[in-house]
């Protein structure tokens, strides 16, 4: 079953399209990483799926319903980001009680255990928390809601490294015990790739690819060797990224269609694997080049 279905989804903001004819499907009970540069359209997509915003054109379905102003979607979807706001009249304990009333699958015991583990006090006020503590409390809401579609938009903003690790471990343990569809938008792909089953990479509001983690890890390889040999050997291959290393050596990343590894070794070319996070950066680099080109 597909929890999310988008066809030719377009969202215009001002004079620009934040999303451009985006077509995707996301299956139930999966953890998907939503990856892209700032301004790629990640937050726009998540807010449309959550029913916060209405699409300009195209079709979007969540649980086979149009999410905008859908009570069913509102009760079964949660969108967590660092801009979540709560009434200044409510204490943290009050917020948890209200969440218990609203979300049908709310796990009060899990919320209480996480609340104690991260050293919150019942009478604290959300707006008075530090940025990292706000993100941590928001994470508790996201996990304890047990919504069938749970979306985290840069959920670890402001968190210490140790808290981020605790969050990812808590998310994975709770997902394994209570499977649901989870989408995580993050700039820290290297931190979450072990959690993910799929990666959706978007660039300029369009889908670049939607692959399983296994497919992504096999997508490309790195080649290092003498510049002349690398240029000749990659002439008919799709080069994703290339840079000069020293005077006569080049490193490049090529799509892994058919790579004769033995021939490469005979030519003195070193073949290496590519980290998923690095590959996504290479794929979405601006056409005008990298930062090194500024100093030429």
Give the ranges of each region predicted by the language model:
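ABC transporter nucleotide-binding domain
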Residues: 168, 172-183, 187-254
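ABC-family P-loop ATPase nucleotide-binding domains
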Residues: 72, 79-138
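Catalytic Walker B motif of ABC-type/P-loop ATPase nucleotide-binding domains
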Residues: 150-154
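The feature captures the beta-strand-to-loop junction immediately N-terminal to the Walker
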Residues: 32-37
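Helix-to-loop junction immediately C-terminal to a conserved catalytic motif
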Residues: 50
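Conserved ABC transporter NBD signature motif
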Residues: 58-72
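C-terminal coupling/interaction segments
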Residues: 247-296
């Amino acid at each position: 079953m597909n929890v999310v279905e988008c066809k030719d989804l377009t969202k215009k903001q001002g004079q620009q399209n934040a999303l451009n004819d985006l077509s995707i499907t996301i299956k139930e009970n999966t953890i998907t990483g939503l990856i892209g540069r700032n301004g790629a359209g990640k937050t726009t997509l998540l807010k449309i799926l959550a029913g916060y915003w209405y699409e300009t054109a195209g079709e979007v379905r969540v649980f086979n319903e149009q999410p905008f102003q859908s009570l069913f979607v509102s009760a079964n979807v949660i969108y967590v980001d660092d801009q979540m706001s709560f009434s200044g009249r409510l204490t943290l304990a009050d917020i948890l009680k209200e969440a218990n009333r609203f979300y049908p699958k709310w796990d009060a015991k899990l919320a209480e255990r996480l609340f104690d583990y991260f050293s919150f006090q019942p009478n604290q006020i959300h707006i008075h928390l530090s940025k990292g503590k706000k993100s941590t409390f928001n994470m508790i809401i996201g996990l304890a809601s047990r919504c069938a579609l749970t979306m985290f938009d840069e959920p670890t903003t402001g968190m210490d490294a140790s808290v981020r690790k605790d969050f990812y471990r808590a998310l994975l343990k709770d997902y394994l015990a209570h499977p649901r569809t989870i989408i995580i938008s993050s700039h820290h792909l290297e931190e979450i790739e072990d959690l993910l089953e799929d990666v959706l990479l978007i660039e300029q509001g369009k889908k670049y690819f939607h692959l399983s983690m296994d497919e992504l890890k096999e997508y490309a390889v790195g080649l290092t060797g003498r510049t002349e040999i690398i240029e000749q050997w990659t002439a008919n291959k799709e080069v994703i990224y290339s840079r000069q290393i020293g005077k006569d050596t080049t490193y490049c990343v090529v799509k892994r269609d058919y790579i004769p590894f033995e021939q490469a070794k005979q030519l003195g070319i070193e073949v290496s694997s590519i980290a998923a996070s690095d590959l996504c950066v290479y794929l979405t680099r601006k056409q005008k080049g990298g930062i090194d080109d500024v100093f030429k």
